[in-house]
């Protein structure tokens, strides 16, 4: 190859690379209907393909619906140590989760599944150190990806957080005849074990006035299976709208390992690819 041809080849490669970077910066400039750029650019670790289904999406993770869907191989998502902010957590006990996504004409359902050898169901402990899982979405997906540390002032995120202690079956078993346990749970009855929140960085987690996410978790055979469900679109300006494919992140806390707040395992951004 001559010097002239080599220089031309390098110039073309640089031009393509610049165009790719521009694509990433403007997000939808090169893909008006999705966020596929994050996979191509390496900003997303992997993609989860959501399956289109007919009929209702059950909230019970033990429903045969999910067992049949499980015939479609779930995506394995690795969870990383949280080493960005204090208290850092170099060794989270949950290293990975399986995720399945389904969508009908009006709703999105996501099933998380991970191994957990112990169910922490002592209410006195679980009030602060309970098994938990959360999904995080950028509120404005047309902008650059938010910081993985729960967004920032200009990059607000919508978070769905499930807590085992809010599961009615677990709460009732945990209380028993212990008066102090009853006192702890009094006035803390939740309509759903999943809370709809927003955040603009660490220590800014805020409960929304409107709670639009439902869910349920079941612990069987040393495994948690948790369903999150919400309408694809709504009128709440604090909620993410699922009009197109979008990025998301996953976090898991193991109460038995004394994990809470920033002490968790967290994924990188992944693409939730809608049908």
Residue ranges with predicted function:
Residues 215-222, 238-242:
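Exposed beta-sheet edge/beta-hairpin loop segments within beta-rich domains
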Residues 14-21:
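Sec-dependent signal peptide recognition
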Residues 170-218:
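Short helix-loop boundary/capping segments
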Residues 61, 107-114, 224-230:
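Short, well-ordered beta-strand segments enriched in hydrophobic/aromatic residues
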Residues 1-12:
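N-terminal secretory signal peptides that target proteins for export/translocation
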Residues 31-71, 125-186, 234-275:
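Acidic/polar low-complexity flexible segments
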Residues 27-29:
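C-terminal motif of bacterial Sec signal peptides marking the signal peptidase cleavage site
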Residues 116-123, 236:
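Short amphipathic, basic-aromatic surface patches that mediate peripheral association
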């Amino acid at each position: 190859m001559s010097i002239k041809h080599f220089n031309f080849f390098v110039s073309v490669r640089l031009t393509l690379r610049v165009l790719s970077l521009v694509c990433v910066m403007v997000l939808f400039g090169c893909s008006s209907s999705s966020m596929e750029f994050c996979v191509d650019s390496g900003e997303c670790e992997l993609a989860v393909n959501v399956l289109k289904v007919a009929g209702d999406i059950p909230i019970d993770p033990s429903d045969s619906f999910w067992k049949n869907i499980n015939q479609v191989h779930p995506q394995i998502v690795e969870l990383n140590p949280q080493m960005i902010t204090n208290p850092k957590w170099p060794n989270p006990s949950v290293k990975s989760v399986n995720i399945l996504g389904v969508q009908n004409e009006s709703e999105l359902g996501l099933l998380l599944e991970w191994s957990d050898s112990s169910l922490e169901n002592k209410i006195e402990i679980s009030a602060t150190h309970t098994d938990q899982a959360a999904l995080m979405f950028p509120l404005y997906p047309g902008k650059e990806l938010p910081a993985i540390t729960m967004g920032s002032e200009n990059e607000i995120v919508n978070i769905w957080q499930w807590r085992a202690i809010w599961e009615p079956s677990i709460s009732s078993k945990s209380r028993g005849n212990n008066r102090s346990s009853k006192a702890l749970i009094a006035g803390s009855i939740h309509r759903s074990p999943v809370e709809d929140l927003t955040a603009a960085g660490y220590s800014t987690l805020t409960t929304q006035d409107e709670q639009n996410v439902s869910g349920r978790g079941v612990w069987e055979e040393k495994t948690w299976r948790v369903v999150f469900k919400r309408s694809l679109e709504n009128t709440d300006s604090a909620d993410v709208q699922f009009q197109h494919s979008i990025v998301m992140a996953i976090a898991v806390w193991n109460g038995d390992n004394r994990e809470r707040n920033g002490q968790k395992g967290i994924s990188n951004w992944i693409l939730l690819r809608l049908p």
